[in-house]
């Protein structure tokens, strides 16, 4: 994930799309995993921008990752509107290319 193209997001729309949310706002582009290794995973966004200032500072918050269209219940999420999209020119999943 560290070699993702700047400002490209690896989130794919569809039944396998994952959403990772937190109480922190990442000001630059992030790459999110397109699949979850477990039903519920604790993940944090990976910033893919080559920004001089880190857009994410580790904290004690607990991010949540869940698989859309899965039968597994999502913990503590209600009344949240989520929209996923693929940025122009970023149709392919980010792949390490070092």
Swiss-Prot record:
Residues 3-59 are annotated as: 3 X 5 AA repeats of C-C-X(3). The keyword Repeat applies. GO terms for molecular function: structural molecule activity. Keywords: Acetylation, Keratin, Repeat. The modification N-acetylalanine is found at residue 2. Localized to the cortical keratogenous zone in wool follicle. It comes from the Eukaryota. In the hair cortex, hair keratin intermediate filaments are embedded in an interfilamentous matrix, consisting of hair keratin-associated proteins (KRTAP), which are essential for the formation of a rigid and resistant hair shaft through their extensive disulfide bond cross-linking with abundant cysteine residues of hair keratins. The matrix proteins include the high-sulfur and high-glycine-tyrosine keratins. Interacts with hair keratins. This is Keratin-associated protein 3-2. It comes from Ovis aries. The gene is KAP3.2.
């Amino acid at each position: 994930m560290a070699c993702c193209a700047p400002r490209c997001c690896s989130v794919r729309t569809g039944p396998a799309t994952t959403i990772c949310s937190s109480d922190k706002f990442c000001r630059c582009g992030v790459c999110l995993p397109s699949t979850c290794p477990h039903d519920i995973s604790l993940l944090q966004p990976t910033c893919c921008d080559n920004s001089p200032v880190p857009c994410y500072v580790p904290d004690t918050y607990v991010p949540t990752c869940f698989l859309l269209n899965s039968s597994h219940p999502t913990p503590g999420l209600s009344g949240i509107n989520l929209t996923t999209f693929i940025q122009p020119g970023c149709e392919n999943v980010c792949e390490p290319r070092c």
